[in-house]
A protein has these predicted regions:
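Conserved phosphotransfer cores of two-component systems
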Residues: 52-53, 76-82
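Non-catalytic signal-transmission and effector/linker regions of two-component phosphorelay proteins
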Residues: 1-29, 117-126
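Acidic, metal-coordinating helix/loop segments flanking the phosphotransfer/catalytic sites
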Residues: 41-57
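Short, structured coil segments at secondary-structure junctions
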Residues: 31-34, 82, 101-104
Length: 126
């Protein structure tokens, strides 16, 4: 990505890190007007530090088998030292506890994903 500008920072974008195509398609269809979603299974596909900061928040699928969600959180928090909101979807209590210790922000059931997306899009609408 080119050097971030004020215009690119004001774009309303969210990243969904999940291998679940149905979840990604559902979230994409539920996006409010003016928002865009980037769906990936590898955090590196979002780019570097400055690229990831262009997203308002991230939705992370804790039920993923294609990647380790804890590695994603570790990369964002420890390696990149980013303080972007990480909203976790799914996962059992042990997965959620591990993600909480890794410094993920919020946790929701899979069936609440659309409502969570719309709620946070409203909060990050600036």
């Amino acid at each position: 990505m080119a050097t971030p500008t004020v215009a690119t920072r004001l774009q309303r974008r969210v990243a969904c890190i999940s291998a679940d195509d149905a979840l990604g398609a559902t979230l994409e269809a539920a996006l409010p007007e003016g928002w865009a979603i980037t769906r990936v299974t590898d955090i590196a596909a979002l780019g570097d530090f400055a690229d990831i900061l262009q997203y308002r928040f991230l939705i992370l699928d804790l039920d993923a088998d294609a990647f380790d969600p804890l590695d994603v959180i570790d990369t964002l928090r420890r390696e990149m030292m980013l303080n972007i909101a990480i909203l976790c979807i799914g996962g059992d209590p042990a997965q959620r506890d591990a993600a909480r210790l890794a410094r993920a922000d919020r946790f929701f059931e899979r069936d609440a994903a659309v409502g969570v997306l719309q709620q946070f899009c409203g909060q990050y609408e600036w």
